[in-house]
C-alpha cells in the first residue's frame, strides 16, 4: 500500500514534468542559457520555500517540476544542434569526414549522414567551421534526365564508417511548410543535423576520394552489410516482400515500396512492417523467457549463482539488455527508444519489488522518454505507443484482478487444454479490439484515416509477423536461407492484405478534426473500454459527433480562397469556393519514389476531405505535373484540364479531360474562372511541337471585386500576347516561371498592377529563382512579394485581400529555419 500511495503522489509531479516539456516546445525562439538557468534556480527556490504540508506542498513541488523540466528542455535544445553560418551557404567547400549512418539508395544516387572532421573553402583554402553532422546527397552528373540528373553516371557505393574527401555545397536545414504537414526540419533537428547539401560532381570538380575504412560507427557498418546481403539474396524475388524483410531486420523503412505502405496503412498494420515497439517488446519477452529457462536449468547443473539470483529477475535484466542491442542494431529509432525506456522502467520496478498501476508505469516511462528526447512529444508514434501500451497494461491488470490465472471453470464437455487455448484466443481478440478502439481517435487526428478492417487484419498479421516472419528474418542474418523462408512467409500475408485493402469501406477517410474534438473522441473511446456503467458508454457516443462530422470551413458564397502550397521548386495552388475546388498544377517530382503529390498534396486534400472538381495542369514540365498521378489516383472523379500533348500518359489516368484554351470560362458559387492562354487555333493546335512553357494554361479568377491570375511558366512572348489582347488589373499574381528573368516583363506588370506577387520556388534552388532583377521590378512598382521559402504555404482570401497567412509564421518554433 505504501508503494501504491507513493506512486500516486509521484504521478502529479510526473504530469507537471511532462507539461513543462510541452510548454518549452511551444517557444518560437530559444532563450539564452542564463535565462534557462534562472528558471531552474527559481524551481529550486520554490522547493526550498515549500515547507508547509498538504496541498500547498504538493502544488509547489509540481510547479518546481514544471519549471525545472522547462529549463532542462531548453538547455537540451541549446546543445542539440548548431546550424551552418548563412555566409557559407551556397559556397563550394572541401570536406573531410566519415559516413555516419547507413546510406539510403535512391534512383538518382545516395543520401547519407556525414560527420565532418575538417572543412575548407575551395576558392581561398582557408579553414571554416561547419556543423559536425550534415546530410548529403550524392547524385549523378547534371543536366541529362527530366529530373536534372544523369542516371547513367550514378556515384559509386558509399559505406558507413568510410572516410571521404569530397566537395559539397551546403545550406541550412530547410523543409516544406504546409498546414499539418510533415515537419522535415523537426526531423533534422532530432537527428542533430545542422546542414544539408549535395556533393559537387562533373568535369569542373574533382571526384570524391575515398580515404579508407575506419572503425567508427561499427553498428551502422554492420547494419549496411546485413542489408546489402539480404537485398542480394532476396533480389530475385518479389521486390516489395524483400524490402519488408530488410526493414524488419535493419529498420530501413525506405526499403519498402510505397504501394505496400499504402496497403499497410489501409489495413492498419503499418506498425508491424518496420522496427516498432511491438517487435522490441516481443524480442525482449522471448529473450527473457529463454534466459530464465536456461538460468533454472543451470541450477540443476550445479551453478550456485542460480540459487542466489531469482530466474525471473535475471531473465528480465537479460531481456532488457538484449532488447537494447536489438534496438541499437535497428538504427535506434524513436519508436524503439521509447520501448526500451518503458521496458527499463518496468524492469526496475520489478527488481525493486514495487507494484505500480499501469497508468503510473506509463507516466514514469513518458517522463523518462521526454527527458532524453523532448521532441518525441510531437511525433504521432509517441502518442500511439503510450496509449496502446497503457490500455493493454490496464486491461491486463483489470482482467488479472477479476479472473485468476488458470484453467479453472472449464465446462465438463470441454477439455482443460482446449478451454485454456480458447481463453487465450478470446483474450487476444479482446485486447486487439480494445487497442483498435482506443487508437481510432488518434489515427483520425494524426492521419485522417481509420482502418475498418484493421482489427481483422491485425488478428492475422500480429502473430504471423511477430512469431513467424520476424524470427525467421532475424535468424536469416546468420543463415541466409531462413531469410528466404521469411520472404515466402510474407507473400501470402501481403496477398491477403492487398485483398482486404480493396474491400469497399476498408478504411474511412475523414477530415482531420481540431485537437479538442479529437480529445473528446479519445475520452469516448476510453470510456468504451473502461469498466463503467453501460449508460455512461451510450452517453459517451455524443462525444464522437464533433470529430466524426467536423468539416473544414469554406469560403462564403461569392468569395474564394487560394492556398499556395509549399512544394519546393514547382507550382501547386488549391483554389476553393463555397462548394467547389480546383487544383492548379501538382508540384514537382523529387525522385522515382517521391513527388509532391504523395508528400504534400494527397495529405493536404485528405485532411480537409477535399473533393476536387478540376485538376488544371498548366503544361507538361515535371515541376508542374510531378504529383498529378497521385492526385488523379486519389481523386478519380476530377476533370483534367491541360495543354499536355495527346499521347501523354496522364490523359489515360483521368476519367474525364479537356484541353485548356483561351475563351473557356465558368462560374462557381458566384466566382468566375476564365482561361486566358493558350489560344489553340491554327498553328498552335499541335501542342507536341511547341515549347512547353509557351503553352502554359493561364487562369484568371474573380469574384467581381477582387481577382487573381495564375500564370504558369509563360515567358516574355506569351506575356506580350496577353497584353495585346487586354489584361485587367489583379490583386494577386502567381509570378510566372517562378520569377525567372525570362518572364515578368515591365509591360505585363504594368497591365496587371498586382498588389501581391506570390513566388513558388525552392530554397536556394539551382536555377536562382526568383531572379534579383525580377524582384527589383516588382518592388519598384510597390508590389508586395512573398515567396514560399520565407512564407511556407500561403493562404489568401478574396474577402480579405490585404492579408496573407504564412504557414511558416503561424507554426514557427525554435527549430524552424528563418531564411535571411
Regions found by a protein language model. Give the residues of each.
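Membrane-interface helix/helix-cap signal primarily in integral membrane proteins
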Residues: 2-4, 61-271, 594-595, 599-603, ...
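Membrane-embedded alpha-helical segments of integral membrane proteins
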Residues: 5-50, 379-382, 482-529
Amino acid at each position: 500500500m505504501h508503494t501504491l500511495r507513493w506512486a500516486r503522489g509521484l504521478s502529479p509531479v510526473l504530469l507537471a514534468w511532462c507539461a513543462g516539456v510541452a510548454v518549452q516546445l511551444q517557444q518560437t525562439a530559444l532563450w539564452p542559457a542564463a535565462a534557462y538557468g534562472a528558471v531552474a534556480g527559481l524551481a529550486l527556490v520554490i522547493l526550498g520555500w515549500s515547507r508547509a504540508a498538504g496541498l500547498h506542498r504538493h502544488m509547489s513541488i509540481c510547479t518546481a517540476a514544471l519549471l525545472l523540466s522547462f529549463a532542462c528542455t531548453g538547455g537540451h535544445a541549446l546543445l542539440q544542434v548548431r546550424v551552418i553560418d548563412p555566409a557559407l551557404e551556397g559556397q563550394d567547400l572541401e570536406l573531410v569526414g566519415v559516413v555516419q549512418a547507413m546510406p539510403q539508395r535512391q534512383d538518382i544516387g545516395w543520401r547519407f549522414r556525414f560527420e565532418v572532421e575538417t572543412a575548407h573553402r575551395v576558392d581561398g583554402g582557408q579553414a571554416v567551421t561547419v556543423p559536425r553532422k550534415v546530410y548529403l546527397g550524392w547524385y549523378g552528373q547534371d543536366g541529362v534526365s527530366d529530373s536534372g540528373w544523369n542516371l547513367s553516371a550514378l556515384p559509386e557505393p558509399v559505406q558507413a564508417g568510410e572516410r571521404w574527401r569530397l566537395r559539397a555545397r551546403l545550406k541550412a536545414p530547410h523543409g516544406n511548410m504546409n498546414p499539418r504537414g510533415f515537419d522535415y526540419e523537426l526531423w533534422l533537428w532530432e537527428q542533430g543535423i545542422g546542414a544539408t547539401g549535395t556533393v559537387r560532381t562533373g568535369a569542373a570538380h574533382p571526384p570524391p576520394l575515398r580515404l579508407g575504412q575506419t572503425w567508427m560507427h561499427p553498428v551502422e557498418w554492420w547494419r549496411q552489410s546485413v542489408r546489402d546481403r539480404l537485398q542480394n539474396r532476396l533480389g530475385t524475388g518479389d521486390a516489395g516482400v524483400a524490402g519488408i524483410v530488410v526493414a524488419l531486420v535493419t529498420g530501413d523503412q525506405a526499403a519498402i515500396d510505397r504501394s505496400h505502405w499504402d496497403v499497410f496503412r489501409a489495413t492498419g498494420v503499418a506498425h508491424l512492417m518496420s522496427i516498432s515497439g511491438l517487435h522490441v517488446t516481443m524480442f525482449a519477452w522471448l529473450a527473457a523467457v529463454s534466459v530464465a529457462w536456461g538460468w533454472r536449468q543451470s541450477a540443476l547443473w550445479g551453478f550456485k549463482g542460480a540459487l542466489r539470483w531469482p530466474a525471473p529477475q535475471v531473465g528480465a535484466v537479460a531481456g532488457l539488455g538484449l532488447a537494447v542491442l536489438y534496438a541499437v542494431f535497428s538504427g535506434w529509432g524513436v519508436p524503439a527508444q521509447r520501448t526500451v525506456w518503458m521496458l527499463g522502467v518496468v524492469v526496475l520496478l520489478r527488481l525493486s519489488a514495487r507494484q505500480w498501476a499501469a497508468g503510473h508505469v506509463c507516466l514514469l516511462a513518458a517522463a523518462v522518454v521526454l527527458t532524453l528526447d523532448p521532441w518525441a512529444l510531437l511525433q504521432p508514434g509517441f502518442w500511439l505507443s503510450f496509449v496502446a501500451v497503457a490500455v493493454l497494461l490496464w486491461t491486463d491488470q483489470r482482467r488479472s484482478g477479476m479472473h485468476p490465472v488458470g484453467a479453472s471453470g472449464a465446462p465438463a464437455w470441454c477439455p482443460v487444454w482446449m478451454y485454456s487455448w480458447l481463453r487465450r484466443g478470446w483474450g487476444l481478440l479482446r485486447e486487439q479490439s480494445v487497442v483498435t478502439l482506443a487508437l481510432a481517435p488518434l489515427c483520425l487526428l494524426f492521419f485522417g484515416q481509420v482502418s475498418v478492417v484493421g482489427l481483422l487484419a491485425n488478428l492475422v498479421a500480429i502473430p504471423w509477423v511477430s512469431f513467424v516472419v520476424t524470427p525467421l528474418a532475424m535468424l536469416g542474418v546468420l543463415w541466409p536461407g531462413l531469410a528466404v523462408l521469411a520472404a515466402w512467409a510474407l507473400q501470402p500475408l501481403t496477398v491477403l492484405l492487398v485483398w482486404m485493402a480493396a474491400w469497399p469501406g476498408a478504411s474511412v477517410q475523414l477530415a482531420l478534426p481540431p485537437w479538442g474534438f479529437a480529445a473528446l473522441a479519445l475520452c469516448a473511446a476510453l470510456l468504451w473500454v473502461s469498466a463503467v456503467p453501460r449508460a455512461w458508454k451510450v452517453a459517451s457516443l455524443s462525444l464522437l459527433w464533433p470529430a466524426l462530422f467536423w468539416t473544414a470551413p469554406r469560403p462564403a458564397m461569392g468569395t474564394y480562397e487560394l492556398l499556395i502550397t509549399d512544394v519546393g521548386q514547382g507550382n501547386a495552388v488549391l483554389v476553393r469556393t463555397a462548394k467547389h475546388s480546383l487544383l492548379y498544377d501538382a508540384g514537382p517530382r523529387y525522385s522515382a519514389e517521391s513527388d509532391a503529390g504523395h508528400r504534400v498534396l494527397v495529405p493536404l486534400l485528405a485532411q480537409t476531405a477535399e473533393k476536387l472538381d478540376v485538376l488544371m495542369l498548366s503544361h507538361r514540365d515535371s515541376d508542374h505535373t510531378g504529383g498529378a498521378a497521385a492526385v488523379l489516383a486519389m481523386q478519380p472523379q476530377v476533370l483534367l484540364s491541360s495543354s499536355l500533348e495527346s499521347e501523354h500518359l496522364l490523359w489515360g489516368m483521368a476519367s474525364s479531360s479537356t484541353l485548356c484554351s483561351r475563351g473557356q470560362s465558368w462560374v462557381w458559387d458566384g466566382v468566375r474562372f476564365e482561361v486566358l492562354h493558350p489560344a489553340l487555333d491554327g498553328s498552335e493546335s499541335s501542342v507536341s511541337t511547341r515549347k512547353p512553357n509557351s503553352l502554359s494554361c493561364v487562369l484568371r479568377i474573380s469574384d467581381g471585386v477582387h481577382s487573381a491570375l495564375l500564370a504558369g511558366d509563360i515567358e516574355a512572348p506569351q506575356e506580350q500576347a496577353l497584353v495585346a489582347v487586354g489584361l485587367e488589373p489583379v490583386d494577386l499574381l502567381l509570378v510566372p516561371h517562378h520569377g525567372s528573368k525570362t518572364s515578368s516583363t515591365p509591360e505585363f506588370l504594368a497591365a496587371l498592377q498586382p498588389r501581391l506577387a506570390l513566388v513558388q520556388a525552392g530554397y536556394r534552388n539551382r536555377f536562382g529563382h526568383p531572379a534579383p532583377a525580377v524582384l527589383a521590378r516588382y518592388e519598384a512598382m510597390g508590389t508586395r512579394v512573398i515567396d514560399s521559402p520565407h512564407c511556407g504555404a500561403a493562404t489568401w482570401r478574396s474577402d480579405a485581400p490585404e492579408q496573407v497567412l504564412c504557414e511558416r509564421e503561424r507554426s514557427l518554433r525554435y527549430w524552424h529555419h528563418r531564411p535571411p
